[in-house]
């Protein structure tokens, strides 16, 4: 027999979730899925259950996934090493083939299958399907020479996202699972950072929330302390003083652009915590770092 205390605690948890379920009913929540949550079995299972539950209580989760560690593993198997500049993967033609194989094939279908096994109806896509993510080659500015631009290969900069396909799937109660691969004017493939795709998609869909899952508790200051709440202006300061760097750069850029362009809030959460999505969306305290526009 469970103790009455344990039962009461469960009831309180359910009661705490009720106002959030009501508030976010029929709202779109874009989730960037990555990090340890994609590789550890217990975290994969809890993620899938969370997504299905969000859908069942009336929210519209849209998943954008990464796959960096899996891509790196395959590159090593073929004798190549991953190279990053300012948090972006340098992508030559051979690397692009591997990216498409891993992201659009192996990982995407694994996530779809996982969600479906837990009672959801997930559909896997890349941005090439219906050409719904149009992209062009990205050039990045050299930190040492402001007038110099660096070509990092088939890395895409988003030009346009057509939301009609995603809205159609949402309306039919499917859960879109999107690999961040875009398509150019000539049909060429582009590897796009998953954080940037998630942010731009959240803007396009006018999402209530953007959630980025990471391998850290959230945004940390220079002493390693968690910053639980940030405004857009404070984020700009952290960019300027170098607190935000490396792989966190595209995440924060995605979050900042999203909240400046109509997304109500962005949450950077620790994907290593079981049921992190539910803790963030359905509890009073939440987890991780909340980023909002001014005010």
From Swiss-Prot:
* InterPro entries from the UniProt entry: AceGlu_kinase-like_sf (IPR036393), AcgluKinase_fam (IPR004662), ArgB (IPR037528), Asp/Glu/Uridylate_kinase (IPR001048), Glu/AcGlu_kinase (IPR001057), NAGK-C (IPR041727)
EC class of the enzyme, as a word: transferase
Q: Where in the cell is it found?
A: Cytoplasm
Which molecular function GO terms apply here? Answer: acetylglutamate kinase activity; ATP binding
E.C. number: 2.7.2.8
Q: Where are the bilayer-spanning segments?
A: none
Domain of life, per UniProt, equals Bacteria
Where along this sequence does the record place binding of substrate?
67-68, 89, 191
**Can you supply a Gene Ontology BP term from the record?**
L-arginine biosynthetic process
Its annotated pathway reads: Amino-acid biosynthesis; L-arginine biosynthesis; N(2)-acetyl-L-ornithine from L-glutamate: step 2/4
For this UniProt record, give its keywords in alphabetical order, as a comma-separated list: Amino-acid biosynthesis, Arginine biosynthesis, ATP-binding, Cytoplasm, Kinase, Nucleotide-binding, Transferase
One GO term of the cellular component aspect? cytoplasm
Q: Catalytic activity, per the record?
A: N-acetyl-L-glutamate + ATP = N-acetyl-L-glutamyl 5-phosphate + ADP
Q: What does this protein do?
A: Catalyzes the ATP-dependent phosphorylation of N-acetyl-L-glutamate.
Query: What HAMAP family does this protein map onto?
Result: ArgB (MF_00082)
Spell out the NCBIfam families in the cross-references.
Answer: argB
Similarity section: Belongs to the acetylglutamate kinase family. ArgB subfamily.
Name the chain's protein. Answer: Acetylglutamate kinase
**What is the species of this protein?**
Nitrosomonas eutropha (strain DSM 101675 / C91 / Nm57)
Q: What is the lineage of its organism?
A: Bacteria, Pseudomonadati, Pseudomonadota, Betaproteobacteria, Nitrosomonadales
Gene name as annotated: argB
């Amino acid at each position: 027999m469970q103790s009455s205390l344990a039962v009461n605690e469960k009831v309180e948890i359910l009661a705490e979730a009720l106002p959030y379920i009501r508030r976010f009913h029929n709202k779109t929540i874009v989730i960037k899925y990555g990090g340890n949550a994609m590789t550890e079995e217990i975290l994969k299972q809890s993620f899938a259950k969370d997504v299905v539950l969000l859908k069942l209580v009336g929210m519209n989760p849209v998943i954008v996934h990464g796959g960096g560690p899996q891509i790196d593993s395959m590159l090593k198997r073929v004798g190549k090493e991953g190279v990053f500049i300012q948090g972006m993967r340098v992508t030559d033609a051979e690397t692009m083939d591997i990216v498409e194989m891993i992201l659009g094939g192996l990982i995407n279908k694994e996530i779809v299958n996982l969600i479906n096994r837990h009672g959801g109806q997930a559909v896997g896509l890349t941005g090439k399907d219906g050409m719904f993510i149009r992209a062009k080659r990205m050039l990045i500015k050299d930190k040492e020479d402001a007038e110099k631009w660096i070509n990092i290969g088939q890395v895409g900069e988003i030009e346009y996202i057509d939301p009609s396909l995603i809205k159609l799937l949402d309306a039919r109660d499917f859960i879109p699972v999107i690999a961040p691969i875009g398509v150019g004017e000539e049909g060429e493939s582009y590897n796009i950072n998953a954080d940037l795709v998630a942010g731009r998609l959240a803007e396009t869909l006018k999402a209530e929330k953007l959630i980025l899952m990471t391998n850290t508790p959230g945004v940390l200051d220079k002493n390693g302390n968690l910053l639980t709440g940030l405004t857009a202006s404070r984020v700009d300061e952290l960019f300027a003083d170098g607190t935000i760097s490396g792989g966190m750069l595209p995440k924060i850029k995605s979050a900042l652009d999203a909240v400046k362009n109509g997304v109500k809030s962005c949450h950077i959460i620790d994907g290593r915590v079981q049921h992190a999505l539910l803790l963030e969306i359905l509890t009073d305290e939440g987890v991780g770092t909340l980023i909002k526009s001014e005010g």
